[in-house]
């Protein structure tokens, strides 16, 4: 149930474990939860670099002429000491078959080599008992005489409430006296109403042919390339406690994976996320081989977008985001070929997009607190989901996105900064049409020169200021902005008022260029301003 491979590197500051480190291989026992029946079934998870495999236990014939057959008919000879040598649980009153819950070592059931904990009892001496109550099956087995022939089949999805052991059963207390209960072991290792107490021959067959074994068998493999994780119940804002679901690119779902401890759940959420992230990086490298140096993919991955004006029962839906070259893309499904990049739902110019950490908070839920938190002390419960960020584009268009881990939020913040700064340095400048008092002008934001305003027809420069001369600004929230510059000679503040068709895009562009300029002078400045990363590494 551990993980193999090197330990994660220490974080640069503060506590360790903030970075997602891919797991080579990882296995554990978990539960597969069925939301319709509200039952959970024991499974084994196996994580490799590229695939998450769900395994279920089954009984298989590994020798003889019945190889592969699960259904078995076995004759038990009741012994003077130990009886049938097994206990049962379940019954139709709980909508589950009666199953063998214990097999006692060296007693009748164990000697056959054909019966296993988890076997569902289908027939007793030819009588079908699939729909029988617990008490009815107990009565049949106790009063069946010295020889009892039972037909069984391994129940691959035994509800967890039956509490069947996964390993070799050990001795247990005897519940055979008094009234039997479908959720407790009814001991059949004592004598029933047999006609004799003389020693009997061992139960058959004692030969090793056929030979049966209980094994973990692969039942589902979920490819992790471009897969996504969901911790929320479908169609709601209800967080699944200590559970999550993995959905492959083709829609195949792992089902709801529930873990026995919060620490296990956290470890597996981080491990699966890390492997998905590693495969995404490989896909980015492949895509970048086909792209020019100015059109490289900087970051991409799954998020959940908050729907505008949506019904409160379902306010988020999955989206795939990408930062590539000069653009920010919003997809409904990931781009897997060069041609897919033209089918984005939305495309925005990076220089005209404002990114900010929108909402992230903690709860008392240890599932969130176990290695997932950012360390914030100011909690805000306005939104139902933590780890949200906002994207505000031109004309006031905005999106709110949510990610599953705090480390993912920090990665998106860092990647937006990097992609924007790269684009600012590549383009060097951006020019916008504007007007003032009826005159058409051009306004240029230049990485090297700062701000320039000139006449659109004559190209005559009206004024020019450096970034450092901008001391403040104000706008009407619609089209007009006032820029306050300090004259280097007079030290006086000069106000320049302009009107733009898309004021929001211009303001975001100014912000992008100034931030990139500051970062070029002081590379550590943006890290100090990063809200998510600041709390990721704080103690």
UniProtKB/Swiss-Prot annotation:
Residues 73-156 form the PDZ domain. GO terms for molecular function: actin binding; neuroligin family protein binding; PDZ domain binding; structural molecule activity. CDD domains: PDZ_syntrophin-like. It is a peripheral membrane protein. Residues 168-183, 194-205 have a biased composition (Low complexity). Residues 168-209 are annotated as: Disordered. Gene3D superfamilies: 2.30.42.10. Residues 296-421 form the PH domain. Widely expressed. Strong expression in brain and testis. In CNS, it is expressed in the perikaryon and proximal portion of the neuronal processes. Strong expression in the hippocampus, neuron-rich dendate granule cells, and pyramidal cell layers. Highly expressed in neurons of the cerebral cortex. Also expressed in the cerebellar cortex, deep cerebellar nuclei, thalamus, and basal ganglia. It comes from the Eukaryota. Transmembrane segments: none annotated. Pfam families: PDZ, Syntrophin_4th. The keyword Phosphoprotein does not apply. GO terms for cellular component: cytoplasm; cytoskeleton; dystrophin-associated glycoprotein complex; nucleoplasm; plasma membrane; sarcolemma; syntrophin complex. Keywords: Actin-binding, Cell membrane, Cytoplasm, Cytoskeleton, Membrane. The keyword Ribonucleoprotein does not apply. One of its GO terms (biological process) is central nervous system development. Its main location: membrane. It is found in: Cell membrane, Sarcolemma; Cytoplasm, Cytoskeleton. Interacts with the dystrophin protein DMD and related proteins DTNA and DTNB. Adapter protein that binds to and probably organizes the subcellular localization of a variety of proteins. May link various receptors to the actin cytoskeleton and the dystrophin glycoprotein complex. The association with dystrophin or related proteins probably leaves the PDZ domain available to recruit proteins to the membrane. Belongs to the syntrophin family. This is Gamma-2-syntrophin. It comes from Homo sapiens. The gene is SNTG2.
């Amino acid at each position: 149930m551990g993980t193999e491979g090197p330990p994660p590197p220490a974080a640069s500051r503060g506590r360790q474990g903030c970075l997602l480190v891919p797991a080579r291989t990882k296995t554990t026992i978990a539960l597969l939860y069925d939301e319709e029946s509200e039952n959970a079934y024991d499974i084994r998870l196996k994580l490799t670099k590229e695939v998450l495999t769900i395994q279920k236990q089954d009984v298989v014939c590994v020798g003889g002429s019945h190889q592969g057959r699960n259904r078995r008919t076995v004759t038990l000879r009741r012994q003077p000491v130990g009886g049938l040598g097994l206990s049962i649980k379940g019954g139709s009153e709980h909508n589950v078959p009666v199953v063998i819950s214990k097999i006692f070592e060296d007693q009748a059931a164990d000697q056959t080599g054909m019966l296993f904990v988890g076997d569902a009892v289908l027939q007793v001496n030819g009588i079908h008992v699939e729909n029988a109550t617990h008490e009815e099956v107990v009565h049949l087995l106790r009063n069946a005489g010295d020889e009892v022939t039972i037909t069984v089949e391994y129940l691959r999805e035994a509800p967890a409430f039956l509490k069947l052991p996964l390993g070799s059963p050990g001795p247990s207390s005897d519940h055979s006296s008094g009234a039997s209960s479908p959720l407790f072991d009814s001991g059949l290792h004592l004598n029933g109403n047999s006609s004799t107490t003389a020693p009997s021959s061992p139960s058959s067959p004692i030969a090793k042919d056929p030979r049966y074994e209980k094994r973990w068998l692969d039942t589902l493999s979920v490819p992790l390339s471009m897969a996504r994780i969901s911790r929320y119940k479908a169609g709601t804002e209800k967080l699944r406690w200590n559970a999550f679901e993995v959905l492959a690119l083709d829609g195949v779902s792992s089902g709801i994976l529930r873990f026995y401890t919060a620490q296990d759940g956290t470890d597996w959420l981080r491990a699966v996320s890390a492997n998905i992230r590693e495969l995404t990086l490989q896909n980015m490298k492949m895509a970048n081989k086909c792209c020019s140096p100015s059109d490289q993919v900087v970051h991409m991955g799954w998020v959940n977008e908050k729907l505008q004006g949506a019904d409160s029962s379902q306010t988020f839906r999955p989206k795939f985001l990408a930062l590539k070259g000069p653009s920010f893309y919003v997809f409904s499904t990931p781009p897997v070929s060069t041609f897919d990049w033209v089918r984005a739902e939305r495309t925005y110019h990076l220089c005209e997009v404002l990114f900010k950490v929108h909402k992230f908070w903690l709860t008392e839920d240890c599932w969130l607190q176990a290695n997932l938190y950012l360390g914030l002390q100011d909690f805000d419960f306005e939104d139902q989901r933590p780890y949200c960020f906002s994207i505000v584009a031109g004309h006031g268009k905005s999106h709110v996105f949510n990610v599953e881990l705090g480390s993912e939020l920090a990665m998106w913040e860092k990647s937006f900064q990097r992609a924007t700064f790269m684009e600012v340095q590549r383009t060097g400048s951006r020019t916008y049409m504007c007007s003032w008092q009826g005159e058409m002008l051009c306004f240029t934001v230049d990485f090297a020169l700062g701000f320039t305003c000139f006449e659109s027809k004559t190209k005559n420069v009206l004024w020019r200021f450096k970034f450092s001369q901008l001391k403040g600004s104000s706008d009407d929230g619609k089209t007009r902005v006032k820029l306050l510059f300090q004259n280097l000679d007079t030290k006086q503040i000069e106000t320049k008022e302009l009107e733009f068709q898309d004021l929001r895009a211009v303001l975001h562009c100014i912000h992008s260029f100034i931030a990139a300029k500051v970062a070029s002078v002081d590379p550590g400045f943006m890290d100090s301003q990063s809200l998510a990363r600041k709390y990721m590494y704080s103690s």
